[in-house]
Amino acid sequence: MLAEDFIREARSAQPELPPPQLLQLVAYQEALPENAEGDDQNAVFRASVLKALSKNFSQEDRPLIRFLLEQEIVFHENSWGIFESIRLCGALLFLLAQAGDVGLLWEAKTANFDTMSGFDIQLLVGAGVTQTLAYLQQVEEEWAEDARIYLEECQQAGDFQNLECYREGLRASLR
């Protein structure tokens, strides 16, 4: 199946996620030991779906993008390094600008040592710094407090001063 065909089939199920038999094509699947491709049998196809999706996406694609990010998080929790696919998921959710995605984006940021340094903190505040911090203030969970404190420190350090330039740069990179 081609990535474009996968997206077309996935969109036919909107606003719900596609059926499990379709999702299994992009779900994290631990690779067999002799597989030289990496730790995830579906990583390459998932990356091609993300690349194709990034050319034309909307709010209706958000459940699928979130699912893809969940798979990338599991992949990164079980591997070293950071791959472009997790960054691309983050970029798409950043551009969709929903404060409710910050929890999943925080999971991506903290998936491993390399994502902590290589997954841009700006990706967590697509809805805006104030809106994201207000959302986190309402969530009574430990991760939310950790994320809020980290974001406040980043705000004080000036990491969000050029957020609109960052947004425009992401948009331009997807064209």
Task: Cite the ranges covered by each PLM segment.
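N-terminal alpha-helical scaffold/docking segments in eukaryotic complex subunits
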Residues: 1-57, 150-152, 170-175
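Long, helix-rich interaction regions
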Residues: 1-15, 81, 102-175
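Amphipathic alpha-helical scaffolding segments comprising HEAT/armadillo-like alpha-solenoid repeats
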Residues: 2-4, 16-35, 59-76, 98-110
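Alpha-helical repeat scaffolds in large eukaryotic proteins
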Residues: 11, 48-58, 69-73, 94, ...
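Extended aliphatic helical segments
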Residues: 26, 43-44, 49, 74, ...
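Structural detector for internal amphipathic alpha-helices that build alpha-solenoid repeat scaffolds
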Residues: 44-56, 79-96, 118-127
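Compositionally biased, low-hydrophobicity segments enriched in charged and small polar residues
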Residues: 59-92, 130-136, 142-143
